[in-house]
Amino acid sequence: MEPSIKYPIYEWELLQDTYYQKSAIGKAEWEYIDPVDFMFAVAPCGGAIAITRSESNLQSNYKYDQVPMYSICVFCLSGQLLQTLTWDKTSLVGMGWNENEELIVVSKQGQVRVYNLLGEFHQFSLGKGVENIGIRECQFSEGGVFALLQNDTFISITGFEEPWRKTYASIPFNTLEYYNIDSWALIPNPFSPDLGMDIVVTVGPHILQIDEQDSQLHSISSLQHVSHISISPNARYLALYESVGKVRVISSDFSKELLDLRLPETVAEASLKQMAWCGNDAVVLVHENLLTLVGPFGGSVPYLYNHTPIVSTEVDGVRILTKDSSEFLRKVPAPLENIFHIGSKTPGAKLVEAFQKMKLKSVFAEKMLLELKDELHDAVDTCVQASLNEFSIEWQKVLLEAASLGKNSLRMYNHQEYVDVCRELRVLNAARDPNVGIYITHEEYLHLGLERLIQRFSCRQLYGLAVQASMWMQIPCDWVYIQWAQTYIKQSSEPEEVVLDNIVKRLSSRKYISYEKIARTAYQEGRLILSTKLLDFEPLAKHQVMLLLNMEAYEQALKKVIETMDNNLIIYVVLQIKQQMAIASFFQILNEYPDAVKVYVEFAKKNDRKTLHDFFYQDDNKQGIAVLAVEDTLKTATVNQRITSLKSAAKVCSESKELSLEEKCLGDEIKLLQLQQTYEDQFTGNFVGLTVNEVVVKLIQINQTQRANKLRSDFQIPEKRFAWLKLRALVAIRDWVQIEQWAGSMRRSPIGFEPFVTEILSAGNKKEAAKYIPRCTQLTTQEKVDMWVQVGDVKSASEEAAKSKSGSVLGDLLERVQTMPESRFVQNALDQLRR
């Protein structure tokens, strides 16, 4: 191997049987600041560092002019200043980060601000009464703030968008006979309804776990005063530091004690500055300028510094920051140990050695590859995984080239995995660049997620890198362009035409990108003209509409929503406008858009008839008002109410010549209702709600023929329709006598006599039906023959057929009835015809 490349094992330290690696990840550029002199907070997963002047250490940091009073300086891990945040002249009690790299700042009065790296923030309070009590300390979880108040009670706020406050149970100091909280930490409670956090508190030699309801005392033998307590990233272990210089590690359920280590007196005598976990495997102690790594079985490794370091736990290690350095301490990942351990004979180590010999054109390289045989696949996988866990780009190349050599010798290998690893390394190395300063490990990358990492690029205004990383990983990046445009609008003082032109030019290459969020930002920044113009580029009208409503550009919103032809969206917009405007102004705007009127009318008929009536009234829409009145009759309980509603509708129609026909129809309906009410009073049965035809039928069936005739005259029922109604009414009640009398009284039936035959026959009375066949003068011989057959009178059918003197008619008839005894009549008629 080239001598210029430092072998990875040179950075390793052996702690009992486990290797740990402390890597320098860049020379800090903040040499004028010693972080230990300030209040600080380190973001997880290689994120930013926030420092501000600490009131508890003013003598040490008064000289730092580079950090202004009442300001928070945010640096990346390489020491570059990212942002300077200003806050009100209030005392801060704590700072913390979430994994979105948002800084959470808490004042002693209970005010909380959540900043992003652009300096934007939103603010809320920890609740009523906190300002008067005051906050002593605070700690942070991914989604919440936990505060110890001056009265020794705990509260929390979870959900920064919609803060939700919880108050924890009180500590029973009188029972414990100790009255000071020495240390505390947050521990997940898997049994709580919201999977929230409990608080572990040490009071003298006692340790308690408290939630909202109660406190639970845990017994730990010979426990002394605990000055520091820390929970591992996986929440399975608790580290306790006792004032006598003893370190204990117990399980988070308090069932097992895993470590009980007393430090040397020379170390224990010094004040412990910090205690933190190195991943989930070891504990780090900071005494002045000494950092001690304590292993799970009691071994330790000391690291001496020129300045007091500050430490911050990560999921796979611990970050170490001093005035002039930035380092990362972790347990050596298994793939790296397999390859680079001295004397390693693992398949991965052999493959790397074979590659190195191949570069030197050694004849032994191919022999070593052949010796791997069945282990070659495992060797390739190990090299690929080791490259992901290696910081050095030179060693990454060695490992990937070795893996490439091995996979090319395999017949069956998923090459896509190799490609994916190369892409991930490209992103990780870009993040670790000193100009970016996000020194993230692969395990932290898996924990954080690709989207959040790219979001960090964007929040640092490294938009080009964010787009490149998205392209490397083949994921959408439109949101990066949107964030760039939003930030540009917020920070630019250029004329709106210039801003618009620059945004459109930059985004023109992106098809189907949404301008709605950009336009919303312009609106929130008070740039209304720019917002409106940006909306013209929004491809989806429904996105335009929502923002136009917020901007109170109601006419534009109505115009845009009609283009969608989405009735649900149209009615939503119309109702929003109605809610925000005076009713007269609402009607005025609505009248200008007939398509919106149609949709609103259909909606209002079912949901808001009063407003619809007012709308028709102001528009002088007589027909609309009349229709509403008529529809209202269907919902009224009594006939008189219906008549009143119909009279109102008729009166409206009478005011317009164009509605004369409607007026007449309404008058007829009123007259019918009045008659129906009269009939119900005089006869049994229901008449109200029936049609004119149904009333006629019912009157005939109850032998009120004269009233039926009167109804026919009043409502001008055509003669044919009345005849049909009367026939069917009499057939329905089987009044054959009245049918016969009625038929006998008519010289000519308006509907003919064929319906008499068919209607009576359908009622099952063939004998009565046969009486009317002779009067069916309009029928052909064949039709009459068919009728006689239907009523079962074959003899009459044969006589009718014989009148035609047609052999074919008689022949067809004979064929139809030849199985019947009466067929002889047909045969006789046929014989007579042939003579």
Curated annotation (Swiss-Prot):
Q: Name one GO molecular function term.
A: actin binding
Domain of life of the organism in this record? Answer: Eukaryota
GO BP: endosomal transport; Golgi to endosome transport; intracellular protein transport; late endosome to vacuole transport; vacuole fusion, non-autophagic; vesicle docking
Q: Which UniProt keywords are present, listed alphabetically?
A: Protein transport, Transport
Q: Cellular component GO terms, alphabetically?
A: CORVET complex; cytoplasm; cytosol; endosome; HOPS complex; nucleus
- Keyword Zinc present in the record's keywords: the answer is no
- Quote the PANTHER family the UniProt record gives: VACUOLAR PROTEIN SORTING VPS16, VACUOLAR PROTEIN SORTING-ASSOCIATED PROTEIN 16 HOMOLOG
Q: What does this protein do?
A: Essential for vacuolar protein sorting. Required for vacuole biogenesis, stability and to maintain vacuole morphology.
Per the record, the similarity remark reads: Belongs to the VPS16 family.
The protein here is known as Probable vacuolar protein sorting-associated protein 16 homolog
Q: Which organism is it from?
A: Schizosaccharomyces pombe (strain 972 / ATCC 24843) (Fission yeast)
